[in-house]
Each structure stands twice: as C-alpha cells, then as structure tokens.
Amino acid sequence: MKDTLFNESLNKRFCFDEKVAHVFDDMLERSIPYYHEMLNLGAYFIAQNLKENVYHKSLPKPLIYDLGCSTGNFFIALNQQIQQDIELVGIDNSMPMLKKAQEKLKDFNNVRFECMDFLEVKFKEASAFSLLFVLQFVRPMQREVLLKKIYNSLALNGVLLVGEKIMSEDRILDKQMIELYYLYKQNQGYSHNEIAFKREALENVLVPYSLKENIALLESVGFKHVEALFKWVNFTLLVARKT
C-alpha cells in the first residue's frame, strides 16, 4: 500500500501504529536509499560469519535476534542467504507491525515474533543481533545500556548489525546532506508538504548520531572491530564483531 500518511499534518508525534504498519514497507523503500541492498548485505555478512566460525558449542543452533523487526523484511533476506538450521527471533513493541510480519513469514518455521520492549528483554546467548534503523529511535540515555546487553549476550565472534540514519558533525555538510536526501525523497514521489510534515512528526522522536559517535558508542561497550559496510550520504550500515 502506498505511503500517503503525510499528505497533511498529523498534529502528533510519529508512532508505529496501525496506520503506519499498513504503509510501512512502501515508506521504507521510498525513504531509505538502497534499503534492500543493505538488508542483503547485512544478511550476507551474518551468513558468512555463521559459516566460518560462529556455530557456538553451547548453542543447539544459531540464534539471531532482530530488534525492532517491524514487518520482518530482514528475516526474509536472512532465509535467502542462510542454508543451515537457524532460529530467528523478532522483537518489536508494535503489534500492528508484528501482524504484518507474521503474515509475510507464515511459511517459515524457523521464525517467531515477540511483542515486547526489547530494552526489557533478557536475551539468550546469540550468534547475531540486528538493529536496522532502530537505534535512532531509542532514547540517547538508553542506547549504551541496550548495546551493552547485546554485547554481553553475543557468542564469541558473534556480530551485531546496526543500520542508522546519521548526521554530520559539520553544520554546513549536514545541511547539504539533508538537502540531497530531501531531493532523493522528492524523486521517490514525496511532495514538499509530505517531507515537511513527516520531519515535524519525527522531531525529537528520531535522534541521529554521527558516524563517529555511533562507532564510539559500539566501541565503548566492548566491540573492538567495527566497520562501515555501506554508506550513502546520511545513511550507513555498520557491523561490529565480538572477539
């Protein structure tokens, strides 16, 4: 279904409710440059990591968490890349999103979804975690706490994927990056009003960090190896490995 939510001002903060869930896939594809390419790239690195050295002895089979899984797109990409038996757990606090995810992945028997606040979940030991365009919605004070929980729950050599909208620490460059991104959205069919109304709704809801800040945050919780797998202007995909 086409995203037309912001044809007029919602006069409220952005939230992942039923209206958003109905159009969310279209919103993602038209709002995040190279969205599917980043999903496939992230799935490839998790698949390679599992194949090479992360089948941890204490795990009956590899467990992968997708936090803020929304409509389940990343699990589709993972199932296309990974041939071995795996367990996929998607956690999201939006039931409308999870209903969409369950519909899309009903034919996969290795997936389960839980409607919970992932900040309160006690994770099992896992081979991989993903936070794809999610950390930017977590309150800044809670980000380090969440990442430390993830780090402590990762098996040795396990990986964390982090996809984020980012900002530049240089005011002029940041303005230019935002302008280019808005041009991208216009080319995807969004009007000036839609872009402005969505920006208004996301104010103080989506709080981006710079690339440097995100990497420093990952390193602060224990990750010694963090790489940018992909970057387009103000979007990036990071991989962090526990060693």
Curated annotation (Swiss-Prot):
Reaction(s) the record says it catalyses: prephenate + S-adenosyl-L-methionine = carboxy-S-adenosyl-L-methionine + 3-phenylpyruvate + H2O
Keyword list, A-Z: S-adenosyl-L-methionine, Transferase
GO MF entry, a single one: S-adenosyl-L-methionine binding
SUPFAM superfamilies: S-adenosyl-L-methionine-dependent methyltransferases
EC top class named in words: transferase
Residues that, per the record, bind S-adenosyl-L-methionine: 35, 68-70, 92-93, 199
GO-annotated biological processes: tRNA wobble uridine modification
Covalent S-S links between cysteines: none
InterPro entries: CmoA, Methyltransf_25, SAM-dependent_MTases_sf
Assembly and interaction partners: Homodimer.
This protein's name: Carboxy-S-adenosyl-L-methionine synthase
